[in-house]
């Protein structure tokens, strides 16, 4: 299994709305892609912003290509991201999941 991690920062007052939007875009699109297994959204407060992390889980790298395109290291961003004053990471990180107990 492969974990795909993407991060972005936004103003704290945008957190609730951005997470709702993230469900409507990134989570919706990934979860409807063959090979998708699960997703987690994490957040942590920074000094004046909040950092949101989306981790999606996939059966293999080929499934991620179906969602992300040939260059799976490039983050898939959405046209309305700017509404949330988002500071997105342009690239994602992939991990091999060795073990998962939950």
Functional labels for PLM-detected ranges:
Residues 9-22:
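Short, surface-exposed ligand-recognition loops at beta-strand->loop->(often short) alpha-helix junctions
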């Amino acid at each position: 299994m492969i974990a795909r991690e993407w991060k972005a920062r936004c103003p704290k007052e945008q957190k609730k709305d951005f997470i709702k939007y993230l469900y409507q875009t990134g989570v919706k699109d990934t979860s409807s892609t063959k090979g998708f297994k699960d997703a987690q959204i994490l957040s942590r407060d920074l000094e004046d912003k909040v950092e949101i992390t989306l981790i999606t889980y996939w059966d293999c790298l080929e499934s991620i290509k179906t969602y992300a395109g040939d260059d799976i290291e490039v983050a898939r961003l959405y046209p309305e991201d700017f509404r949330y004053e988002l500071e997105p990471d342009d690239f994602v990180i992939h991990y091999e999941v060795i073990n998962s107990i939950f």
